[in-house]
């Protein structure tokens, strides 16, 4: 289990580095601290392949990269929450969480708090389930593409209905 946790922390840094974030020296030092703590240099760490990077790469081709990134970040916050009582790595985890605040949440603690709030909603609570189903239509509406909701406006001049001549249409030119 310890090796898995270390690999997860390393993957977090790699995910952020690949997505264009600049890893400062202190962040790298903290990740090195986690690697030492979890003995991630052991040969069995790589068994079974990568944990999330293969999945993340598959989403690089789509424009919906933020969706998978938010799931990966959610995963790491759950991991960090599970490790919060470990005094030996508490400072390292705090540094990494601060870096996430800057790079993923655009330095907005309010966005991070909202993210954490949604992440911690208990899905097995019947009252939560009722509220979630009640709000589902509104959520689906907000997720729908905005472009399909708008009607295109057509310029009257292009179809002969306007008073202005259209320089691209020979029929609209006056003699």
UniProtKB/Swiss-Prot annotation:
Per UniProt, subcellular location reads as:
Secreted
Modification Pyrrolidone carboxylic acid occurs at: 24
Residues bearing attached sugar chains per UniProt: 39, 106
By its UniProt entry, which SUPFAM superfamilies does this protein fall under? 4-helical cytokines
Keywords, A to Z?
A: Antiviral defense, Cytokine, Glycoprotein, Growth regulation, Pyrrolidone carboxylic acid, Secreted, Signal
Question: In what tissue types does this protein appear?
Answer: Released primarily from activated T lymphocytes.
Task: Output the Gene3D superfamilies linked to this UniProt entry.
Answer: 1.20.1250.10
Q: Which Pfam families match?
A: IFN-gamma
Report the domain of life of the source organism: Eukaryota
| GO biological process terms, semicolon-separated | adaptive immune response; defense response to virus; humoral immune response
| Glycoprotein is among the record's keywords | yes
Q: Output one GO MF annotation.
A: cytokine activity
- What is the residue range of the signal peptide feature? 1-23
Q: Where is this chain primarily localised?
A: secreted
- Any one cellular-component term (Gene Ontology): extracellular space
Per UniProt, subunit arrangement is: Homodimer. Interacts with IFNGR1 (via extracellular domain); this interaction promotes IFNGR1 dimerization.
Can you tell me which family this protein belongs to?
A: Belongs to the type II (or gamma) interferon family.
Its biological purpose: Type II interferon produced by immune cells such as T-cells and NK cells that plays crucial roles in antimicrobial, antiviral, and antitumor responses by activating effector immune cells and enhancing antigen presentation. Primarily signals through the JAK-STAT pathway after interaction with its receptor IFNGR1 to affect gene regulation. Upon IFNG binding, IFNGR1 intracellular domain opens out to allow association of downstream signaling components JAK2, JAK1 and STAT1, leading to STAT1 activation, nuclear translocation and transcription of IFNG-regulated genes.
Protein name in UniProt? Interferon gamma
- Species in which this protein is naturally found: Peromyscus maniculatus (North American deer mouse)
- The gene for this chain is IFNG
């Amino acid at each position: 289990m310890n090796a898995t946790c270390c690999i997860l922390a390393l993957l977090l840094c790699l995910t952020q580095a690949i997505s264009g974030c600049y890893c400062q020296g202190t962040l790298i030092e903290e990740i090195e601290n986690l690697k030492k703590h979890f003995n991630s240099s052991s040969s069995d760490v790589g068994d079974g392949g990568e944990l999330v990077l293969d999945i993340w790469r598959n989403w690089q081709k789509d424009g919906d990269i933020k969706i998978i990134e938010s799931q990966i970040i959610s995963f790491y916050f759950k991991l960090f929450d599970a490790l919060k009582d470990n005094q030996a790595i508490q400072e390292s985890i705090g540094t990494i969480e601060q870096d996430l605040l800057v790079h993923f949440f655009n330095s907005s603690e309010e966005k991070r708090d909202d993210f954490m709030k949604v992440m911690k909603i208990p899905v097995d609570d019947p009252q939560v389930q009722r509220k979630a189903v009640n709000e589902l239509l509104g959520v689906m509406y907000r997720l729908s593409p905005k472009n399909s909701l708008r009607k295109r406006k057509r310029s009257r001049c292009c179809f002969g209905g306007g008073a202005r001549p259209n320089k691209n249409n020979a029929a609209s030119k006056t003699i």
